[in-house]
A protein has these predicted regions:
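Terminal RNA-binding accessory module
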Residues: 1-77, 365
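Short, aliphatic-rich beta-strand segments
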Residues: 202, 208-218, 278-282
Length: 463
């Protein structure tokens, strides 16, 4: 066969899935072809839309023979929306794929003799998200529109409802759009940095109390009378909304929230509950989006930490304190580190709210670990829950604290495996691993790993 060209048509068999939801295929000559929205075992008639030196991308013209794992009762918007990855396959196959992804990273990247001992799938793969951020833009007809970004773009795709979010979120978003369109308030134009409303930010608690934040392009763009009318409209239309805020973000950036906040109504925060603990949550705070699975995650972390009465716990990348507060035992001495100042304040408040003795500082973890006070804590257990990039610049400093056990919670199997390999060189062996599906229907998976301090044998240099 001649070299593959754009617009070629050919039959392909889908071999496996990738984390972005694309199916992996090979031509008869062994050339790699990626096909979105396919399932392992699909046989398809494919149309080549892009060719590079090392791979091609195709779209499905027809499914000649569907995979036994194909699941067509998914979201009607998933092919255009960039939010979900696996709406088109069975949930059982999705869980299998995610478990394999973690195991592959541990063995291939970390070179570790360790496998996931249990994968915790979600009981509910729909309506689980307690947070939504809807970008707002303008239609060709000059009306404000909102939805989610299309895959790999900043083009807004409109939709009626999101299957994985709290169902009332879409109703509130539509109400906000109605209000701003009735008053000819412009959505944001990302190319020209013009317009008023950039996004609609929603959060809900266990008892369905909701915080609503409008992210604006300038603090001067809504009059006080418009703000009062907005509060009145929301109060009348959506009794679940207990607080309304304005956030100002004038920067030409992908960062959603700016630094300036104003509370129009309510307290500016909501209270949520996980594992019997109560938490104050502000719109800017990191908070797990899947409450049910967060309880599973923290239960595993608590088992791995095995804190005894009176032991000390250092909670790194602690956010609003949820990990440390949920796994703390009787008399646990808790110290937390969090880079976001408001989140660290929330963590301190949440410790008092739950009658737990905790001290929290607002610093980047790698900087806090240079502090003499932290160096002299001598924690019995350390928990880490870093961002996707992992514990960059901190692994050696964490190991130097000499804790008996480290519990590593990760949202990225690749950086987890990389860090575990470094910890092993420094005397901490990964001995147990579990995976929790915090984000059903997406390509993301959460992992929990227990590392145990290894006694150095004679002649062993761990420096």
């Amino acid at each position: 066969m001649a070299a593959l060209k754009k617009n070629d048509r050919l039959r392909l068999s889908v071999e496996t899935l990738l984390g972005n939801g694309n199916g992996l295929c090979h031509t008869d000559e062994g050339f790699v072809v990626f096909v979105p929205h396919t399932a392992p075992g699909d046989i398809i008639d494919a149309h080549i839309i892009k060719v590079t030196k090392s791979y091609a991308v195709a779209k499905t013209v027809e499914i000649i023979q569907p995979s036994p794992y194909r699941h067509e009762d998914g979201c009607p918007f998933s092919k255009n929306c960039g939010g979900c990855t696996f709406q088109h396959i069975s949930y059982e196959k999705e869980c299998e794929f995610k478990e394999n992804t973690v195991n592959d990273a541990l063995s291939r990247i970390g070179k570790l003799d360790l496998k996931v001992e249990k994968f915790y799938g979600a009981k509910n793969s729909c309506s689980y998200r307690n947070k939504a951020v809807y970008p707002v833009g303008m239609s060709k007809e000059g009306k404000a529109i909102s939805g989610f970004y299309a895959s790999m773009s900043h083009r807004i795709t409109e939709h009626d409802v999101c299957r994985i979010s709290n169902p009332v979120f879409s109703e509130i978003r539509d109400g906000v759009l109605q209000f701003i369109n009735d008053r000819n308030i412009a959505g944001y134009d990302e190319e020209n940095c013009t317009g008023i409303v950039r996004s609609i930010h929603l959060r809900s608690s266990k008892n369905n109390e909701i915080s609503l934040t409008l992210v604006l392009n300038s603090k001067e763009l809504l009059s006080s009378s418009t703000e009062r009318a907005f509060v009145k409209f929301i109060n009348k239309s959506f009794h679940e909304v207990v607080t309304i805020l304005i956030n100002v973000n004038t920067k030409n950036t992908n960062v959603i929230l700016g630094d300036e906040w104003r509370t129009l109504y309510g307290d500016g925060y909501i209270y949520d509950e996980i594992s019997g603990k109560k938490f104050r949550i502000t719109p800017a705070s990191f908070w797990q989006v899947n409450r049910e699975q967060a309880e599973v995650l923290y239960s595993v972390a608590k088992e791995y930490a095995s804190l005894e009465d009176g032991e000390s716990l250092l909670d790194l990348y602690c956010g609003t304190g949820s990990v440390g507060l949920c796994i703390a035992g009787n008399g646990t001495k808790l110290y937390g580190v969090e880079v976001v100042e408001e989140a660290a304040k929330d963590a301190s408040f949440n410790a008092k709210l739950n009658n737990i003795d905790g001290k929290f500082t607002a610093l980047p973890t790698e900087n806090a670990l240079d502090d003499e006070y932290v160096k002299n804590l001598h924690p019995d257990v350390i928990t880490v829950d870093p961002p996707r990039k992992g514990c960059v610049g901190a692994v050696e400093k964490i190991a130097a604290l000499g804790a008996k056990r480290i519990v590593y919670i990760s949202c990225d199997p690749a950086t987890l495996a990389r860090d575990l390999a470094e910890f092993e060189i420094l005397g901490y062996k990964a001995i147990r691993a579990s995976a929790v599906d915090m984000f059903p229907r997406t390509g993301h998976v959460e992992s929990v790993v227990l590392l145990s301090q290894q006694k150095a044998s004679a002649g062993t240099d761990l420096s």
